[in-house]
Amino acid sequence: MAKKKALVPFFYLTSIVFLPWLISLCCNKSLKTWITNWWNTRQCETFLNDIQEKSVLEKFIQLEELFQLDEMIKEYPETDLHQFRLGIHKETIQFIKIHNEYRIHTILHFSTNLISFVILSGYSFLGKEKLFILNSWVQEFLYNLSDTIKAFSILLLTDLCIGFHSPHGWELMIGYIYKDFGFAHYEQILSGLVSTFPVILDTIFKYWIFRYLNRVSPSLVVIYHAIND
């Protein structure tokens, strides 16, 4: 009986890990058809942000240049104008289809992430007791580690998050999150977040060492600085 109770938090932790994937799979299957029909039948107003408007305008400028070229070649009767105009018409229709698919993809991913957040928040709130048990296990495990291993682990974690090569990892992670929410890629926003996040984390970490570790385990701070130097 005690063994079963001990396994309950592990099952709960496993469910938290796989629940977002399951929610995403179910929402993508159930919501995609509904959102597609809603978008196509309601002809809803587009809610483009500045970045997406810029992308759309660039596409329309390209089409406008094609139309200007169409006007220019009217001077040459031997050119097959009908085929050329037909090609422009097909490109315009294709662009509209791609734009609609992109908008549907954005709404679908944003809705899925919002639903996942709400469900996981409620699931975590209902399982507070299990989370408390897991937290106590983690604290006990960390407490039993030697100061050398703790210092090495902290150093490894900080190098991964705020080290010399960390910006590339942050760029990949933030870019993935940005894409997962369906937002258009914007280099200036991405580079701004990548350059800001490590600095904020570095400040928080130094404050944590100064206020918490110096009080709880001064020997750990000494070992950490010795390894870091």
UniProtKB/Swiss-Prot annotation:
Residue intervals passing through the bilayer: 6-26, 107-127, 189-209
UniProt record, GO biological process: potassium ion transport
Family annotation (InterPro entries): CemA (IPR004282)
Catalytic activity: K(+)(in) + H(+)(out) = K(+)(out) + H(+)(in)
Topology relative to the membrane: Multi-pass membrane protein
Alphabetical keyword list: Antiport, Chloroplast, Hydrogen ion transport, Ion transport, Membrane, Plastid, Plastid inner membrane, Potassium, Potassium transport, Transmembrane, Transmembrane helix, Transport
Compartmental location: Plastid, Chloroplast inner membrane
Keyword Cytoplasm assigned: no
Major subcellular location class: plastid
Example of a GO MF term: antiporter activity
Pfam family, one: CemA
UniProt GO cellular component terms: chloroplast inner membrane
PANTHER family xrefs: CHLOROPLAST ENVELOPE MEMBRANE PROTEIN (PTHR33650:SF2), CHLOROPLAST ENVELOPE MEMBRANE PROTEIN-RELATED (PTHR33650)
HAMAP family in the record: CemA_PxcA
Primary role: Contributes to K(+)/H(+) antiport activity by supporting proton efflux to control proton extrusion and homeostasis in chloroplasts in a light-dependent manner to modulate photosynthesis. Prevents excessive induction of non-photochemical quenching (NPQ) under continuous-light conditions. Indirectly promotes efficient inorganic carbon uptake into chloroplasts.
Family per record: Belongs to the CemA family.
Protein name from the UniProt record: Potassium/proton antiporter CemA
The species this protein was found in: Lobularia maritima (Sweet alyssum)
Lineage, opening ranks: Eukaryota, Viridiplantae, Streptophyta, Embryophyta, Tracheophyta
